[in-house]
Curated annotation (Swiss-Prot):
Cross-referenced InterPro entries: NAD(P)-bd_dom_sf, SDR_fam
Record-stated family: Belongs to the short-chain dehydrogenases/reductases (SDR) family.
Pathway given in the UniProt record: Secondary metabolite biosynthesis
Species of provenance: Talaromyces stipitatus (strain ATCC 10500 / CBS 375.48 / QM 6759 / NRRL 1006)
Pfam families: adh_short
E.C. no: 1.1.1.-
Function: Short-chain dehydrogenase/reductase; part of the gene cluster that mediates the biosynthesis of the tropolone class of fungal maleic anhydrides. The pathway begins with the synthesis of 3-methylorcinaldehyde by the non-reducing polyketide synthase (PKS) tropA. 3-methylorcinaldehyde is the substrate for the FAD-dependent monooxygenase tropB to yield a dearomatized hydroxycyclohexadione. The 2-oxoglutarate-dependent dioxygenase tropC then performs the oxidative ring expansion to provide the first tropolone metabolite stipitaldehyde.
The protein's enzyme class: oxidoreductase
Gene designation: tropG
Name by which UniProt lists this protein: Short-chain dehydrogenase/reductase tropG
Lineage: Eukaryota, Fungi, Dikarya, Ascomycota, Pezizomycotina
UniProt GO molecular function: oxidoreductase activity
Length: 329
């Protein structure tokens, strides 16, 4: 059971200096993505790639960050580069990956922050449910496209590259617990069917797919080359609730006023997973700053079967789009 009041979170430890490092932040033009970029700059990072759907908005964010007195004084020479990445479209993901590989020699940190939570069933150009496309499919493709490049970055720096994926403990609310798969039913086809769309559980469904894919992928990756983990920052005071109906938004805004963490604190949790958590976090899910125990659903026979199917079906999907590296095959 989730406690109403969230535990207090301490800031990052002193002494973190990211000079010489490069980070990619998806969804960097607002909310936690914007604050992630700000805090990385405050930690003296040399280069941040702002991966955004709206390039003009991204450029305005760069101007805003350049105007920050602290950043201007202490890290004014940092490189901030805006690149287009629309997670709703596979071809945008592939263009972004090529652009990144062609222009940026080394990436040390890939922070997968972009995400949505829609309450209506809508489809992406791929034909998939839009929430699943943005939160899951496109992230899986992005990782597959970049994994050899991230491994090469680690070989050049002799330090593991980090992939940190923003998840949510909402995965525990998955609709699959109430509407289990039929014996021969495919998970991804099930999720795409309108009759199985559960508005208040779809976000959790998408985060379950992310978590299960990450856990399976981590088994294939050498953590001496790439460390991948996932975290839940808890309830954070962002604008994600703006998609709710007015009557629900009013209630949630009251709850957020009492319970939600400031965006700054939510980002401490993300950066803890990306910068502080050790190799033991590889393939793990972190709640706040701690590695969580495996959920009852995931460890159950039904959950294990779903995980196996998700991996196989996702590989089948991705193989139609790109040449997969050995780890994703």
């Amino acid at each position: 059971m989730v406690k109403f009041f969230q535990p207090k979170i301490s800031p990052l430890p002193d002494g973190i200096d990211l000079k010489g490092s490069t980070a990619v932040v998806t969804g960097a033009s607002a909310g936690m993505g914007l604050e992630l970029t700000r805090q990385l700059l405050q930690l003296n990072i040399s280069t941040v790639i702002l991966a955004v759907r709206n390039v003009a908005k991204g450029e305005n964010v760069v101007k805003q960050l350049r105007g920050d007195p602290h950043i201007r004084t202490y890290n004014g020479n940092a490189t901030l580069k805006v690149m287009e990445l629309d997670m709703d479209k596979y071809d945008s993901v592939q263009r972004f990956a090529k652009h990144l590989r062609d222009e940026i020699p080394i990436v040390n940190f890939l922070i997968l922050n972009a995400g949505i939570g829609l309450l209506k069933h809508d489809r992406s150009p791929s034909g998939h449910d839009r929430t699943l496309q943005v939160n899951y499919y496109s992230n899986a493709l992005l990782i597959a496209e970049l994994l050899p490049y991230l491994k090469a970055s680690a070989e050049r720096t002799t330090i593991p590259t980090r992939i940190t994926w923003v998840g949510s403990r909402a995965f525990e609310t998955t609709s699959l617990q109430k509407t289990p798969l039929q014996p021969n039913e495919r998970v991804l086809e099930h999720m795409d069917k309108k009759e199985f769309f559960a508005p208040f559980q779809r976000y959790g469904d998408s985060k379950l797919l992310c978590l299960l894919f990450m856990c399976s992928l981590a088994r294939q990756i050498d953590p001496k080359k790439v460390i991948i983990n996932m975290l839940c920052p808890g309830m954070v005071n962002t604008n994600m609730s703006d998609v709710l109906p007015v009557y629900l938004r009013a209630v949630i805004n009251v709850v957020k006023a009492i319970r939600a963490r400031p965006v700054e604190v939510g980002v401490w949790i993300i950066l803890n997973a990306a910068l502080v958590a050790g190799p033991d976090s590889h393939g793990k899910f972190l709640i706040d700053k701690d590695i969580a125990s495996e959920s009852q659903y995931i460890s159950s026979p039904a959950g294990q079967e779903v995980q196996k199917k998700i991996w196989e079906e996702t590989i089948e999907e991705l193989s139609r789009l790109t040449t997969l590296p050995p780890e994703v095959n």
